[in-house]
UniProtKB/Swiss-Prot annotation:
Chain's gene name: KAT2B
Domain (N-acetyltransferase): residue spans on this chain: 503-651
InterPro entries xref list: Acyl_CoA_acyltransferase (IPR016181), Bromodomain (IPR001487), Bromodomain-like_sf (IPR036427), Bromodomain_CS (IPR018359), GCN5 (IPR037800), GCN5/PCAF (IPR016376), GNAT_dom (IPR000182), PCAF_N (IPR009464)
Source organism (scientific name): Homo sapiens (Human)
Record-listed acetyl-CoA binding positions: C574, A575, V576, Q581, V582, K583, G584, Y585, G586, T587, Y612, A613, I614, G615
Disease (UniProt): Defects in KAT2B has been found in a patient with isolated coloboma, a defect of the eye characterized by the absence of ocular structures due to abnormal morphogenesis of the optic cup and stalk, and the fusion of the fetal fissure (optic fissure). Isolated colobomas may be associated with an abnormally small eye (microphthalmia) or small cornea.
UniProt name for this protein: Histone acetyltransferase KAT2B
Enzyme nomenclature, EC number: 2.3.1.48, 2.3.1.57
Amino acid sequence: MSEAGGAGPGGCGAGAGAGAGPGALPPQPAALPPAPPQGSPCAAAAGGSGACGPATAVAAAGTAEGPGGGGSARIAVKKAQLRSAPRAKKLEKLGVYSACKAEESCKCNGWKNPNPSPTPPRADLQQIIVSLTESCRSCSHALAAHVSHLENVSEEEMNRLLGIVLDVEYLFTCVHKEEDADTKQVYFYLFKLLRKSILQRGKPVVEGSLEKKPPFEKPSIEQGVNNFVQYKFSHLPAKERQTIVELAKMFLNRINYWHLEAPSQRRLRSPNDDISGYKENYTRWLCYCNVPQFCDSLPRYETTQVFGRTLLRSVFTVMRRQLLEQARQEKDKLPLEKRTLILTHFPKFLSMLEEEVYSQNSPIWDQDFLSASSRTSQLGIQTVINPPPVAGTISYNSTSSSLEQPNAGSSSPACKASSGLEANPGEKRKMTDSHVLEEAKKPRVMGDIPMELINEVMSTITDPAAMLGPETNFLSAHSARDEAARLEERRGVIEFHVVGNSLNQKPNKKILMWLVGLQNVFSHQLPRMPKEYITRLVFDPKHKTLALIKDGRVIGGICFRMFPSQGFTEIVFCAVTSNEQVKGYGTHLMNHLKEYHIKHDILNFLTYADEYAIGYFKKQGFSKEIKIPKTKYVGYIKDYEGATLMGCELNPRIPYTEFSVIIKKQKEIIKKLIERKQAQIRKVYPGLSCFKDGVRQIPIESIPGIRETGWKPSGKEKSKEPRDPDQLYSTLKSILQQVKSHQSAWPFMEPVKRTEAPGYYEVIRFPMDLKTMSERLKNRYYVSKKLFMADLQRVFTNCKEYNPPESEYYKCANILEKFFFSKIKEAGLIDK
């Protein structure tokens, strides 16, 4: 090794580019630092031929195995050994990375042992402690001159620096062994960053032109998957829902230990993809998620908590294919209960999730999904994943299947400090036991139903043993039209497939048989339609048909043509064979078609219905009032003489195939809540007799006992709600701006951070803050003053519910609340 500064980890200059971030990585050097000489600590750190960098610890990019599990274990052992060494040995180690301070003119930036150890190093020689008077082979000054700044450093700080030293040496090996240019460049940047932090005795912070800090996208992958479970499976019974939650945990766990392929490999596989965007995420992933698994002196983040939809889209297809292939290969190694979960349920789960990942209008990626579905999420849907400490080491059991969930290991002291899980004594927001005891005394927002009551009602209506009354083995007389069909689909009696003819590839025999079956069903059920016309459209490549299959044969279908550029789909034929009608198949068929179109971002149906079909289409939400402009569809759809044009607008937030189940459950909840309220009000009033005397209507407040139920009349406001939306918007904007500018508004400007307020989101079920209100106002969410006032009132109520009355936050809430009410009175929104 050259003895000039900048040759190796002991003498590599850390000044140039050390402060640059991963987005502005220093150019890859023409000649990387050469291999360390005999006796250099790098040789010992490499640990023989088994050492490798995080990205090179796997054979192929994209594997699901956590890279370098053995490497991280070796590093942990070496750190433990070094931290238990005598102080003199520690000083020798740190001296290698410390600039000489004997003279200002001395440029030596790392002490070099004049008597290097042999290669490979012998165990008996490793324990020899060098004297502080030993001269440096490079500058001839004593070791003490290199470590004079460490004389009064505590053992804890010295151990921290030694941990960084071993991480530097590990990254030095990575730089030399890595073949991919992009990955090598990131390793080199991190190597210099850690090297600089040793020289300056600071904490390494990744920074630079990638100004964005974690999280890089909201909502995160973890939140998106959690939203997906709530969106698609909240209606399921608790046992089935728990299965979905387990699948979600498994999926998130695999992403956290998934190894991303290098940008160069991705460029070869997908030349048309956005490589620059992927490279940016890959760099962030290396710096914040991958390398910190092994170099714990760097702050570590979970991939699923700091990345969002963009990264998930870039890896999902490959990841899904490899996970399922891996599951098939290792099915014999899996326990029986895991085998069913992974081989049967996991593929379906991934398919449904894939549709939401790539859909443009999927609600699971909306920022306000949680606030919009907060009540649904509380009905038994638990958080999909309980986040482990942000920094931690993961151990894999080599004897178990690689699809088993890894166990979270222990965090190092440095990691615990950065994880934010331990409350500091000086934290302002502190939850005390006395506060919990006083919870019942706190005011609550009007209309909120206690979660204990909701959970109790849910446990009653979902537990057959808790429901009173006779057992029934058949569908209720009031069950939804599609309930029988939905149950048959779950049992596998019926199936739904979108099929169509193709000019590009030869359809398989099964699809051709189904197309012929569809032609026959439409011909029999639509006798006034020419058979040749039906055949032409069914086999037209521009048309598709949602086929209903039972016992392997077609019993119904909906033929349609999509016009993506116009934003609508034309329904051409819709029929179910006569002997299979009145079973709910028609409704369930249409609901599947609606969900199919939501996934393809087409939210309008148009159809010409004859006199016999109008009733059916009305039941499916169609109307004679067409919502889309006439210019969009004139000249595109087929006009039928004597038929009525009908349209249907789809709501992308509604899971149509499960909609009736959700409505039914909501009705059951309301019914049970009413029954409980009735049980609390013991007084029975006689019925109203006024209607017998010809009275057509009476004021609600005149009904005997109505006030005892908790009903309150709405006060007659002198100044009515502004009818003009723009006028209301301007008024609310002015009020909100004045509230935000108030000197007591500072605690409420941003959403409460979990690290600042432990347990806040377990106490406060419906959080609100001024930033969220500003975004809602900007998006025209507040269509009435009541919505606006309810949100701002919730800000104050939440604060008072969480914080004790003597706290500064509580006092700020009282002051700001009075100010707010004075402003809405001035604006004439309430009576003065």
